[in-house]
Amino acid sequence: MLELAHKLADSDTKFFGGWVLAGVEAHIHGQANQLENRVLLEKERKCIIQVRGTTLVAGAEQLVKELRVFLVLPKNKLGTKTIEPGAPTGKLLVEHTFTVQEVRDYVAYTGDENIIHQGEHPIVPGLCMAAWLQQALQKQELDWRISFLTPVYTGDELKIYATEQELAAYVGSTKVFLIKL
C-alpha cells in the first residue's frame, strides 16, 4: 500500500493544496515490478487518480496492484460538517493513536505534501491509516473499497471494528471511515 501511495505522490502538485481523500479502491495481489499513475477524471472540485502495479508473468504484463483514489476539493472548511454519532457495531479488532511524527514519516516517505497533513495537529492521511491497518491485520493481499467520512487528526484514538462484510473505523462514537470487503 505504501509503495502505491508513494507513486500517487508523483501526480500533479495541484492535488496537494487542500484536496481531500473521499474514497479509495485498493487491490493488492502480488509484488509489482513497475508502477505508473494517471489521472482518470479531472474536474474543478473532484478527480480520480489511478496507480497501477504490474509484473511480467510468462512474458505478459499482469496487473497485480491497483489503487484508485477519489479526491475532492471541499467548499467548506474541514471539520465543519456535522456527523451524527452512533454506537460502533461488530468486534473490536485494533486501535491506534497516530502521532505527529508518524504523519511526518509517512509524508517524508510518500511525498504527500498536502497542506492538511502539516502543522502541529495535522489530519492523518487516509492512505497512511489504510497502510497501518493493512500491516496491523497482516494482509498481504486485499480488495478494499474505502469511504472516508470525516477527518482523523493526530492524537485521536482510532478503533477498528469488524463485521462479516466491512470494517468500520471510529473516533469516539463518530464513524470516520468504512471499508467494504
Locations of the language-model features?
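Hot-dog-fold acyl-thioester-processing enzymes
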Residues: 1-30, 72-143
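HotDog/MaoC-like acyl-thioester-processing domains
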Residues: 2-3, 14-15, 19-94, 152-154, ...
